[in-house]
Design a protein with these regions (language model features):
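PRPP-associated nucleotide enzymes
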Residues: 1-213
């Protein structure tokens, strides 16, 4: 915002703003009155910049697009890796992710899980009974932080007899959960949107797609 303010005072028009990871993108609403940051505040910051075009890589919430604050998101990062080997069964962690991403796939075997939080540290996941055992499945979502959802999904898939499981998330936040997930998932694909993961020492089955240099 300081840079935008300098540009405004100098009469410089910001024509293009590209954001790899939009902070607070998951906070569609305030869960507590004393939370310091929410999507509404981020919206005001972006409006203040007055850029002619704003592109965001895989924002969790589409509100900023529907409200005309950002023009559109970058293409999902599948488009950055042409010819990638994608399992024909794709599982989304919830219905919201299904509606965001299912248009990317031209096959019918796409599913979504339903999640129920039993306690602060325990998550129950239910999967569609149509998922067949001994099949290859890709779990796809926008963000992995603590990884709880993906640990629960893997266990649920194991209980159904599915062991060839792959994970792709656009934004990876913490290293420790990634490393632990790599012991379960056959491959994990992330981007360097949040952090320079390509410069970190990671297990061999974690692949980093560079969305910026």
């Amino acid at each position: 915002m300081q840079l935008a303010d300098i540009c405004h005072r100098q009469g410089i028009q910001i024509s293009y703003l590209q954001i790899a990871y939009l902070f607070a993108a998951r906070t569609d609403r305030l869960f507590s009155f004393n939370e310091a940051l929410d999507l509404e505040l981020v919206k005001k910051c972006l409006i203040f910049v007055q850029a002619q075009q704003i592109l965001v890589l895989d924002p969790h919430s589409k509100r900023l697009i529907t409200e005309g604050v950002i023009d559109n998101d970058w293409p999902a990062f599948f488009a950055l890796e042409p010819g990638s080997n994608i399992p024909e069964n794709v599982l989304f962690p919830d219905e919201g992710a299904y509606h965001r991403y299912s248009v990317l796939f031209d096959f019918d075997t796409t599913y979504y899980a339903t999640k129920h939080r039993i306690s602060r540290d325990k998550l129950e996941v239910k999967l569609p009974s149509r998922i067949k055992p001994n099949t290859s499945i890709l779990v796809f979502d926008d963000l992995c932080d603590g990884g709880g959802t993906f640990f629960a999904i893997y266990k649920a898939l194991q209980d159904m007899g599915v062991t060839d499981v792959h994970l792709r998330v656009t934004h990876a936040i913490q290293k420790e959960p990634l490393v632990k997930l790599s012991e379960l998932y056959k491959t994990i694909t992330i981007t360097n949107s949040y952090k320079d993961w390509d410069k970190e020492e990671l297990p061999n089955n974690i692949k980093v797609i560079k969305v910026y240099e």
